[in-house]
Amino acid sequence: MSRFRKTLVSAFVLCLVIFPLLVSAAEEENQCGGSKGGSAAEKASALKYKIIAFFSILIAGVFGVCLPIFGLKTESNFFMYVKAFAAGVILATGFVHILPDATESLTSSCLGEEPPWGDFPMTGLVAMAASILTMLIESFASGYLNRSRLAKEGKTLPVSTGGEEEHAHTGSAHTHASQGHSHGSLLIPQDDDHIDMRKKIVTQILELGIVVHSVIIGISLGASPSVSTIKPLIAAITFHQLFEGFGLGGCISEAKFRVKKIWVMLMFFALTAPIGIGIGIGVAEIYNENSPMALKVSGFLNATASGILIYMALVDLVAPLFMNQKTQSSMKIQVACSVSLVVGAGLMSLLAIWA
């Protein structure tokens, strides 16, 4: 029953993303109406490339997620370099790919100049709100796990009142921070089960941010009538999904999910962009991505996704990796992780030229 509920939740999340996009983009055409495509031959040619994109992106997504999950040992130094690379990829996805897309949508001339559009930085506001919400979800989830664990052990949370007691707890916090444990609950000793559970929460929120963007780019590609637009997007989005999958796969591997859960998360990520392409193909005749409501919906979704990914990359991936004891005690590991982070961010940023 629990698995069934989780499946329903996943389907509900997809519907929340897809349905508003389709309804808003099918409204009456306005002065900013999108192109309707050309001849039947051009549409047939475009369809052929869309089918190629469907399978290419699907395979790249599966391969990207599977490589760190099934091909690497999480205890090795090399896995740390992979995590740094993955963090760079996710950070660049948020800053270079998704945030500019959101800004373009929410500052479009098609929305007019009346408040809150025009000069107001709506994209930054939404991204900031998403980051704060992500932090609150993590904080409350972590607090709930701590209270549940301590309740089972018949203990209560320690409360600092100053003086020696506060100093003792602070010292404990420093010890845990230096050992690379969670940054979120420094006053509370955390066992391995709690740390693993927190990693699972982080990974699931991260996948949500990635999936939202994957659906949007899939629908956009599937609805595009232009062969000249689709051709470069195939390669760009294929590598985009490969690198994103690589980043997500590293987090899934470290979170130690059960095998069935791993496969569910793997397929949930790998199928979202291809499903988006399929939906885009089906609604290509009515889909107008330049309608005001479609711009608002896609802009808000992209801004939300960027806020989630930027927060997760910096707070939950980069900071714990670079501040843990193993990295800090070895110049070789520190330099290698730094290079991997820059390479991951650089390669993902480079893809923004084409996608």
Curated annotation (Swiss-Prot):
Keywords: Cell membrane, Ion transport, Membrane, Signal, Transmembrane, Transmembrane helix, Transport, Zinc, Zinc transport
A GO cellular component entry from the record: plasma membrane
Extracellular-side positions: 26-50, 99-116, 222-231, 283-302
Cleaved signal peptide residues: 1-25
GO MF, one example: zinc ion transmembrane transporter activity
Transmembrane parts of this sequence: 51-71, 78-98, 117-137, 201-221, 232-252, 262-282, 303-323, 335-355
Pfam families per UniProt: Zip (PF02535)
Subcellular location: Cell membrane
Up-regulation conditions: By zinc-deficiency.
Domain of life: Eukaryota
Statement: the UniProt record of this protein carries the keyword Membrane: yes
Cytoplasmic face residues: 72-77, 138-200, 253-261, 324-334
GO BP, one annotated term: zinc ion transmembrane transport
Coiled coil location: none
Membrane topology term: Multi-pass membrane protein
Record region (Disordered): 156-183
Sequence similarity: Belongs to the ZIP transporter (TC 2.A.5) family.
Functional note: Zinc transporter involved in zinc uptake in roots. Targeted by BZIP23 transcription factor in response to zinc-deficient conditions.
NCBIfam families, sorted: zip
Cross-referenced PANTHER family: ZINC TRANSPORTER 12-RELATED, ZINC/IRON TRANSPORTER
The protein, known as: Probable zinc transporter 12
Organism, scientific name: Arabidopsis thaliana
The organism's taxonomic lineage, starting at the top: Eukaryota, Viridiplantae, Streptophyta, Embryophyta, Tracheophyta
Gene behind the chain: ZIP12
